[in-house]
From Swiss-Prot:
<dbReference type="GO" id="GO:0000408">
    <property type="term" value="C:EKC/KEOPS complex"/>
</dbReference>
<comment type="function">
    <text>Required for the formation of a threonylcarbamoyl group on adenosine at position 37 (t(6)A37) in tRNAs that read codons beginning with adenine. Is probably involved in the transfer of the threonylcarbamoyl moiety of threonylcarbamoyl-AMP (TC-AMP) to the N6 group of A37.</text>
</comment>
<dbReference type="InterPro" id="IPR034680">
    <property type="entry name" value="Kae1_archaea_euk"/>
</dbReference>
<feature type="binding site">
    <location>
        <position position="191"/>
    </location>
    <ligand>
        <name>substrate</name>
    </ligand>
</feature>
<keyword id="KW-0819">tRNA processing</keyword>
<comment type="similarity">
    <text>Belongs to the KAE1 / TsaD family.</text>
</comment>
<feature type="binding site">
    <location>
        <position position="295"/>
    </location>
    <ligand>
        <name>substrate</name>
    </ligand>
</feature>
<feature type="binding site">
    <location>
        <position position="138"/>
    </location>
    <ligand>
        <name>Fe cation</name>
    </ligand>
</feature>
<feature type="binding site">
    <location>
        <position position="212"/>
    </location>
    <ligand>
        <name>substrate</name>
    </ligand>
</feature>
<protein>
    <recommendedName>
        <fullName>tRNA N6-adenosine threonylcarbamoyltransferase</fullName>
        <ecNumber>2.3.1.234</ecNumber>
    </recommendedName>
</protein>
<keyword id="KW-0479">Metal-binding</keyword>
<keyword id="KW-0963">Cytoplasm</keyword>
<feature type="binding site">
    <location>
        <begin position="159"/>
        <end position="163"/>
    </location>
    <ligand>
        <name>substrate</name>
    </ligand>
</feature>
<dbReference type="GO" id="GO:0005506">
    <property type="term" value="F:iron ion binding"/>
</dbReference>
<dbReference type="InterPro" id="IPR043129">
    <property type="entry name" value="ATPase_NBD"/>
</dbReference>
<dbReference type="InterPro" id="IPR017860">
    <property type="entry name" value="Peptidase_M22_CS"/>
</dbReference>
<dbReference type="InterPro" id="IPR017861">
    <property type="entry name" value="KAE1/TsaD"/>
</dbReference>
Length: 363
């Protein structure tokens, strides 16, 4: 399913790049095309040094008929839709590939076969049209697109998605990880439970995850294990316990109680770790990003926690919370302005490219 977002649907970014970023070039008119293919979404975005900064975001997401994401099937999907998604992005903003100043691509972290599709296409475009190739870390891109749209200069970051659960903050030229999942990510927990319990797909119903929908009917939460180890979280035991209770549930109310218990434990644990990071760093803002950041329930919990500590909380538009090409284009633009490019021959994908090893030259 293809989705196309433009400034009219994304809204106006609240951040001013001249204040958020320590790089020049904002007086020039520069366009960067970004390609995202780290998991189930093939996305293309175009970013500019001029307002509204994000010109377009086009996504085509692979939805397996059953089970989770198979890397090779996702890669086949990406290869099949790539050319049309790229053309849609260019046509929407009235540009040709020759108008683009650089091509950015997410080189990791992610699923190897899926990553390689995006990397191969980006290399081909850069080499054939003589454009600089810009490497982008997928996790950094989630943070930077959120900073642009929220305008938060120095937040504690809660990055939650299907493949990542990380609490981080910026210090000394890098995003430092305060806590993370020890096993599966928050989004993976929710999706796997819903799938194995037989209540998904679809995973999202009227803007809410199906687990959140299921939980609405509960009178009280089921008792489930809460695991926070220092600053890290663990969800595999929670998943096993929740599925065990689900199979024993004799009524719809008991099933709803399992959903509510799962949600409260999962969301509560990531909010607790974020709260500890906020108290430690004494920062004045919390920023939620990643696919699970689209959850209004998690948003409310984060906002309440931040408010208790006299901090503000914010997040990007839902269309930019999950995987998208716009965040790759924007972070690619920042890298390009900072002079970071890569030779085609050196542009290897990095499936386990950690957030905290990436130097951030624009802050």
């Amino acid at each position: 399913m293809v989705s196309v977002d433009t400034p009219s649907s994304l809204g106006k970014p609240r951040g001013d790049p001249r204040q958020l970023y320590r790089v020049g070039g904002w007086d020039e008119e520069i366009y960067v095309l970004g390609i995202e293919s780290t998991a189930h979404t093939f996305g293309v975005g175009i970013a500019s040094t001029k307002p509204p900064y994000i010109l377009v975001s086009v996504r085509d997401t692979y939805h397996p008929p059953k089970g989770g994401i198979h890397p090779r099937e996702a890669a086949s999907h990406h290869a099949r839709v790539a050319s049309e998604v790229i053309l849609d992005a260019l046509r929407t903003v009235g540009l040709s590939i020759r108008d683009i100043d650089a091509v950015a691509v997410a080189l990791g972290p992610g699923l190897g076969p899926a990553l390689r599709v995006g990397a191969t296409i980006a290399r081909g475009l850069a080499a054939y049209y003589g454009k600089p190739l810009v490497p982008v870390n997928h996790a950094v891109a989630h943070i930077e697109i959120a900073r642009l749209y929220t305008g938060l200069g120095d937040p504690v970051v809660l990055y939650v998605s299907g493949g990542n659960t990380v609490v981080a903050a910026y210090a000394k030229a890098r995003y430092r990880v305060f806590g993370e999942t020890l096993d599966i990510a928050l989004g993976n927990l929710l999706d796997t439970f819903a799938r194995d319990a037989g209540i998904a797909p679809p995973y999202i119903v009227s803007g809410l995850h199906i687990v959140d929908r299921c939980a609405e009917a509960a009178s009280k939460p089921a008792d489930l294990p809460y695991v926070v180890k220092g600053m890290d979280v663990s969800f595999s035991g929670l998943l096993t316990a929740a599925l065990r209770l689900w199979t024993k549930a004799g009524s719809e109310d008991e099933k709803a109680a399992v959903c509510l218990g799962l949600r409260e434990v999962a969301y509560g644990s990531v909010v607790e770790v974020t709260e500890r990071a906020l108290a430690h760093t004494r920062k004045k803002s919390v920023m939620l990003t990643g696919g699970v950041a689209a959850s209004p329930i998690l948003r409310n919990k984060v906002r309440s926690m931040a408010s208790y500590h006299g901090a503000v909380a914010d997040w990007p538009p839902p269309q930019l919370a999950g995987d998208n090409g716009a965040m790759i284009a924007w972070t690619g633009l920042l890298n390009y302005l900072a002079g970071i490019t890569v030779d085609v021959e050196e542009s290897v994908v990095k499936q386990r490219w950690r957030l905290d090893v990436v130097e951030i030259p624009w802050r």
